[in-house]
Amino acid sequence: MNPAKRLTGSALLALAFLSVLWSAVAAAEATAERNQRLVERAFVNWSAGRGSLFDDLLSPTVVWTIRGNGPAAGTYHGREDFLRRAVRPFAQRLATPIVPRVEGIWAREDQVVVRWMGTATARDGAPYRNDYVWIFKMDGQRATRVEAFLDLVPYQDVIDRIALADPSPAAPSGERQVP
């Protein structure tokens, strides 16, 4: 084989390799962008009081881990387990739902990181404010794993300070958004 043909063959092989590599990079970027848009949309809807971030974004089989120390820290297996043991007991102690203010969203491949601040009013009239970082691992259009970082002291203060609301049938059944 003459040198010109060998060089042409090598160049074509390199171009083919770069094309495959570029396609993989483009697919990863497209996935990250799609995931970021899904999470952004869920937070926009939550801020506007539309829908339920937990229903709209979480897989029914999500594994949600709250990092840190305290009774709420730990791993919850499934959306319903998380709602039942962490979200509802907290939401029932609030006079207003938590309103999130997103401070940043970053995505890479199948992970989306959201840094946000939440504010609400507790049933005793005291303000609730907390800073959060949630890391979502996305699969399709649903989060299958979430790691949540927050200051558990103000969260636990609300839990300890305010008795659970009366869960009578007359109480509204809508899901409030919290931790």
Model-derived regions, located:
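A solvent-exposed, acidic/Ser-Thr-rich amphipathic alpha-helical stretch
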Residues: 56-108
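Bacterial N-terminal signal peptides that target proteins for export
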Residues: 2-13
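Short, low-complexity N-terminal intrinsically disordered segments enriched in polar/charged residues
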Residues: 15-52, 56-60, 162-179
